[in-house]
């Protein structure tokens, strides 16, 4: 089935492309969703008339996405997690958690657009890509910290230093306790 795309469709084509798809996909999804129309001579002429409007709409969409990418680059999300021994997370930080944090900040981004190869399972700072359009990606800074705030991290970082210093002085931390 030959169709003309009226919008960008992931893994298929871009606005204005003439594509060949299976009849069921075209009839049951692309055409009813307004993403494509049959590639008949009449529709080709109609599409040429609509293409200027659609291209203007697409340009506006790209401009909005670039603005969103700039705003995302400016923010940093802090996610507090419970941590066990050895700084190992209980569970993991997933795209859904990141999307919820973005929603709290007023960004309406679907979790499927957040790109993580695998969930985050350790403390640290991450630069997480967000797919805004097929050809445009933004990124958001995500910091995964120990629940209870940075004070706990400072205490945890200070403890090995105190133990090393006590051992250097000839005292064991276990003997004093």
UniProtKB/Swiss-Prot annotation:
For whether the record's keyword set contains Cell wall biogenesis/degradation, the answer is no
Q: Does the keyword Glycoprotein apply?
A: no
What keywords were assigned to this record? Answer: Ribonucleoprotein, Ribosomal protein, RNA-binding, rRNA-binding
| Composition bias, Low complexity | 157-167
Q: Where is the composition biased (Basic and acidic residues)?
A: 168-177
The residues forming a coiled coil are none
Q: Where is this region: Disordered?
A: 151-177
GO CC aspect terms: ribonucleoprotein complex; ribosome
Tell me the Gene Ontology biological-process terms attached to this UniProt entry.
translation
Q: Could you give a GO molecular-function term held by this entry?
A: rRNA binding
Q: Which InterPro entries match?
A: Ribosomal_bL9 (IPR000244), Ribosomal_bL9/RNase_H1_N (IPR009027), Ribosomal_bL9_bac/chp (IPR020594), Ribosomal_bL9_C (IPR020069), Ribosomal_bL9_C_sf (IPR036791), Ribosomal_bL9_N (IPR020070), Ribosomal_bL9_N_sf (IPR036935)
What does the UniProt function comment say about this protein? Binds to the 23S rRNA.
- Assigned protein family: Belongs to the bacterial ribosomal protein bL9 family.
Classification via PANTHER family: 50S RIBOSOMAL PROTEIN L9 (PTHR21368)
NCBIfam families per UniProt: L9
Q: What HAMAP family does the record tag this protein with?
A: Ribosomal_bL9
Name used for this protein in its record: Large ribosomal subunit protein bL9
Q: From the UniProt record, report the name of the gene that encodes this protein.
A: rplI
